[in-house]
């Protein structure tokens, strides 16, 4: 059941918007979940992926325990290239294999002041969401008086 008349659920329209999305929206779509440790530390579930983040592939042919650094984020193709995820071409040269960001987990973030600000903002909004709709002890005591 659709509630918002301004949001479409038409598959072809959603595919069109996905593949014709501008770069600033592709950044948002190309987000990856954080590892359990980082999620605990920052109280944030996922972040848009970025060059120099360290990730671990958790789905597909290249999944495994080794952790690699993101070499390139290719927004046009919706893929990221990771340090050790390569294959050999027929002529013998090695090339990076593109992996979708949803199939990796971020194990270390490259932090700068802007990214720290984003983490704080996301954590704050998450905290507000947890407290929403709950009575505090003082309000309960006042109600009982």
Curated annotation (Swiss-Prot):
Top-rank lineage group of the source organism: Eukaryota
GO molecular function: mRNA 5'-UTR binding; RNA binding; structural constituent of ribosome
Self-association state and partner proteins as the record states: Component of the large ribosomal subunit. Interacts with DHX33.
Region of interest called Disordered, as start-end residue ranges on this chain: 1-21, 122-145
PTM notes: Ufmylated by UFL1 in response to endoplasmic reticulum stress, promoting reticulophagy of endoplasmic reticulum sheets.
Phosphothreonine sites (modified residues): 139
Compartments, record wording: Cytoplasm
Predominant location category: cytoplasm
Similarity remark: Belongs to the universal ribosomal protein uL24 family.
Annotated crosslink Glycyl lysine isopeptide (Lys-Gly) (interchain with G-Cter in SUMO2) location: 136
Disease implication from the record: Diamond-Blackfan anemia 11: A form of Diamond-Blackfan anemia, a congenital non-regenerative hypoplastic anemia that usually presents early in infancy. Diamond-Blackfan anemia is characterized by a moderate to severe macrocytic anemia, erythroblastopenia, and an increased risk of malignancy. 30 to 40% of Diamond-Blackfan anemia patients present with short stature and congenital anomalies, the most frequent being craniofacial (Pierre-Robin syndrome and cleft palate), thumb and urogenital anomalies.
Pfam families: KOW (PF00467), Ribosomal_L26 (PF16906)
Name recorded for this polypeptide: Large ribosomal subunit protein uL24
GO cellular component: cytoplasm; cytosol; cytosolic large ribosomal subunit; cytosolic ribosome; extracellular exosome; membrane; nucleolus; nucleoplasm
Function: Component of the large ribosomal subunit. The ribosome is a large ribonucleoprotein complex responsible for the synthesis of proteins in the cell.
